[in-house]
Amino acid sequence: MLIREHHENREEWLAARKAGIGASEAAAVIGKSSFMSNMELWRLKTGMAEKKDMTGNSAVEYGNRLEPAMRVMFEACYPEYKLDYHPFDILYQDDCPFIRATLDGELTEIVTGKRGILEIKTAMTSNKMQWERWKDGVPQGYCCQCLHQMIATGWDFVILYAKLTKMDGDCEIRKYQFEREACLEDMEWLKQKSARFWEENVVKGIQPSAILPEL
């Protein structure tokens, strides 16, 4: 059963995030994050370290400024979906409360009633290596994030809506869709990895074997 935790403000929400693995942290569990290692995530979740203050980080601030506009643009371009946004809600399944997600948008397909997730990305591909990550589709770390969100919600699909700023300054909007039925095997694999990390490493306090993060 889907559980929705509502929090009144960012401070409450940040405190509640410590009770599980968030979607943006899912890739770190399996060494597919370009932002943190599984060891860094373990230290965060066991209270050995505090989350880095990203105030002043240009990429984070760029994304925060553009995210509301991306939601408005999505609604204008895809009126077949109803879009809701709850910035301080945390969603999870009652039998798996440590797999948690706060969504950039909650979608309802108007004709079918299917529920889905909007995931917004605003990537500045300022060098060749960053562009290569997007060249053939969605970077693996973001795929993990989308799988994690479907596990947490039990919903039918994720639409990843991305604004990519290229090396020459031009911008490109991309839309990718993940369907639950096509991802069941990968979702189960990720769920097992996340459960093992949480139950064996976080709850019991056993240090995991280090997995080098992707560049």
Go through each PLM region and give its residues.
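Charged, glycine-rich intrinsically disordered N-terminal tails and low-complexity linkers that flank
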Residues: 1-65
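Phosphate-binding glycine-rich loops and adjacent basic patches that engage nucleotide phosphates
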Residues: 2-3, 25-39, 67, 110-112, ...
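Alpha-helical structural motif
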Residues: 6, 34-38, 66, 70, ...
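N-terminal accessory/interface modules of nucleic-acid-binding and processing proteins
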Residues: 42, 52-85, 142
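Nucleic-acid nuclease catalytic cores
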Residues: 60, 77-103, 107-202
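Glycine-rich and polybasic anion-binding loops at the starts of cofactor/ligand-binding domains
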Residues: 163-165, 208, 212
